[in-house]
Amino acid sequence: MTPQQTRRNDQRSIVPARTPRLRLKPKAPQSGYVDGAWWPRSEDLSVELPDLLAVLSVRLGRIDRVLYHLNAWVKAPRKLTTGGRTVRLDGYRLQPINTIEVLGLDGDRLTLLVVPSHTDAHDAHRTMMTAAQPHNAATVDGLLMISQRDRDIRTEASTAQECWESEGGTTASPRLAQLPG
């Protein structure tokens, strides 16, 4: 897939090539775990971010960093140039899954729930609208309707995979298996 290019309008602001599927809480003191929700079209962070960052820069100003969970996306570069600026992409295994944090250069930040790209449109819309309600304080798992049992199973599987990889095993991740060798 070829990345979509952002463009500048006459006022020198960045205009997304494709409008991101995004809902944000109104700008106010933080309430709840997330500041809104984003439903990307793919699991390729470097393809999805330019349009999202163009929209979020209206609220955050110049974007400095994006933090994400390593296992949630195909391998991403450490830096991404978008709109003529370089943004650091920092992947962590401890970053809460199904979230990204977008940090502005001035220290402002937004934590977004990431609705998996394969989610049914009706369910994704409902989840995004709920996450963007001003006083919604639901957890990420609550918003995505992930039970504690399911989360425990996913955590156990992820821990086992990380242990296997740290001992020299190759990853079983289907996203990593798709990358050219």
List PLM regions with ranges:
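Short linear motifs embedded in intrinsically disordered, proline/glycine-rich low-complexity segments
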Residues: M1-Q4, N9-I14, R59, P174-G181
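Helix-rich interaction surfaces within compact, conserved domain-sized segments
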Residues: P3, V74-G181
